[in-house]
C-alpha cells in the first residue's frame, strides 16, 4: 500500500481565524487595540518578523507578509523619536499590506500611531508575554497550521505509549482490532479517517477527523461512541506516528517475514516509518501481536535490543564454539533430568 502521497498545505489564513484560534491552542492571550476588518488581512508564512530596520527606513527585502512583532526595542525606538519622525517611521511600516502587528510585554503605541494603523486597515494586538515567548508560541501554532497534511484510511491507537497506525484493505477488521485494543486499556486516537500532519523534518502527528472524532463504525453493530462507553481514559486527541501495521489477507504463496531481521519501512509525507505486515488468518490473535509490536518498538528504541539479532548471535556462538560439541556434557535444568 502506497502511503507516500503528496501532502496538502494551507496557503494562508485570515487574521480573524488566527485571533480566534490562537488562544484555544496555546497558553497565550491577544487583546485587540483597534477595530478593523480582520477577514481582509491574511497570513501567508509561518515565520514571524521584528521590523526594526523597516522602522528605520530600510525596507529592501522587507518580509511584510509575516506577522510583525513590536517588542521593547521597537517601541522604545519609536518613543524616542520626535512626533513627525515617529509618524514617518511608522508610515514606512504600515504602507505595506501587513497581516497584523503584535505588541509584546504590554507595550503601547501612541494614539496617533494606532489611528494610522486603523486607517490603513492593519489589526493591532497586544500580549503580556515577552517577545521571546510570544515568538516561540506563535511559531509553534503557525507551524501546525502551515504544515503538510494528508488524510488516510485506517485506525490510530496509542498502545503502551507507542503510536500505532493500522492500515489495510476494507473489511479486514481494522476497526475491530482497534476496539479490542481499547477494551484492553489502550487509547483510540482516530478510526476510519486518520489525519496526519508533518511537523518539522521527521515528526508525524496523527489526529482524528473533526466530524468523526472518536466514533467508530463496526460492521454488524453500527456506530460506537468510544468515549461514552469506555470513558475519557480510552481516547486521546493526537499522537506521534511511530509504527505502521498493515493487515494483509492470508496468501499461502506469499513470503512473510519470519525472523524480523529485515526492517521494512514506509514513507508518509516523506518520512520513513517502521512497517509491520501481518497476514490475517483464522486463530491468529492480532490484538496481542500488535501489543508485542509496540513493546518490541520500545525495547529497540530505549535499549537497542532486537530479539531476532539476539537469537542470531546466540546461534553463531553455538556453531563456532567447538568445545561444547566435544565436552559431552548436557545441560541440567531439573534434578535428574538431562538434555543430551
UniProtKB/Swiss-Prot annotation:
**E.C. number, please?**
2.7.11.-, 2.7.4.-
GO biological process terms, alphabetically, are: regulation of carbohydrate metabolic process
Question: Keyword Ligase: yes or no?
Answer: no
Show the GO MF annotations. Answer: ATP binding; magnesium ion binding; phosphorelay sensor kinase activity; protein serine/threonine kinase activity; protein serine/threonine/tyrosine kinase activity
Provide the binding site for Mg(2+).
175, 217
Quaternary structure?
A: Homohexamer.
The note filed under miscellaneous reads: Both phosphorylation and phosphorolysis are carried out by the same active site and suggest a common mechanism for both reactions.
By sequence similarity, the record places it as follows: Belongs to the HPrK/P family.
Q: What does this protein do?
A: Catalyzes the ATP- as well as the pyrophosphate-dependent phosphorylation of a specific serine residue in HPr, a phosphocarrier protein of the phosphoenolpyruvate-dependent sugar phosphotransferase system (PTS). HprK/P also catalyzes the pyrophosphate-producing, inorganic phosphate-dependent dephosphorylation (phosphorolysis) of seryl-phosphorylated HPr (P-Ser-HPr).
- What is the name of this protein? HPr kinase/phosphorylase
